[in-house]
Amino acid sequence: QEDIEDYEKEKPKDLMSHFRFMVINYENLLKVGYSLGKNVQKLFPYYQGILSNLKEVASEGVPFYRAVDVFALGVLYSERKEEFLDDLKAIYEQMDHTDGLIEYYMVYLFHDKIVPFHSILEYQNMIEDTYESVAKAQGFWYYSHSDALWYNNHTKDTYKGYWSFDTAATCKIKGIFDERLKDLEYFPYDLLVQGD
């Protein structure tokens, strides 16, 4: 009986650790798969895996860069939003902080509206309705993440690829599909044009 009581006390902690691990696992699978050139529709289940696990631990806090990526990927997969919008909403409702960029993505996903935004990610504020503005902003993308855990991972064995899902999502909302975007470093062009 004592062992069962001990297990019941530890189970929620272990379960939360499991969900956090699974979020990271699915993120890695998605990024590695994309870096290897896998079909973006075949990567969609990994996105769903991120969401289904993240919603279980979102009340503990969602790191800012993870939140931006999760909502940006939602925009990039918006043609399939009926398959994930409930999970994304559950995550959003548990978050204790947000940003104008995340709000921008949410309004687009939930209300099919485009509203002005301001983000703490200054490079995002540089994006207008032109390729040139995106190219300029993208030049700041990597260095703007110098405080991210993955920054400089290309020098370690933990590297999975760097992808600016948020820049691509903003381009999708603004209707910027210029073919020159595929030549920008870190820009996930295949995710941007998958619906075309």
Language-model regions, residue ranges each:
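Eukaryote-skewed repeat-based solenoidal scaffolds used as protein-protein interaction platforms
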Residues: 1-155, 159
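Alpha-helical oligomerization segments
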Residues: 132-196
